[in-house]
Amino acid sequence: MKCKVYTVVVPNVQSATLLPIIREKVKPDSIVYTDTFRSYDVLDVSEFSHFRINHSTHFAENHNYINGIGNFWNHAKRHLQKFNGIPKEHFELYLKECEWRFNNSEIKSQISILKQLVKGSLV
């Protein structure tokens, strides 16, 4: 199964900020794999089955990986470097473009979607 990402710029990375976003995007009773970042501790007492992957001790324990997000960030950084800097007020739009490109990684799919968007805007 191909990893899909959802990106959003947040004012901080505290649990109180992250949990509502996670609840909005992830179905209850889903299995959620995270790294050991402290803000994810709240997931232990949430409606999700939460499992932590400690990169330094168990990179792929029981075949459960979180490297999909690492893969996304590698793609995003490579794409964003081409611009030699991005205005802060437009960063979220550039990030959303990276999300779209990652979630629709096949060029044929991207072209098809873009054609549909162009046709829709001409009507």
Swiss-Prot record:
Signal peptide: none annotated. SMART domains: DDE_Tnp_IS1595. One of its GO terms (biological process) is DNA recombination. It holds the Pfam family DDE_Tnp_IS1595. It comes from the Bacteria. Keywords: DNA recombination, Transposable element, Transposition. Coiled coil: none annotated. PANTHER family: DDE_TNP_IS1595 DOMAIN-CONTAINING PROTEIN, SI:DKEY-17M8.2. To insertion element IS1016 transposase. This is Uncharacterized transposase-like protein HI_1328.1.
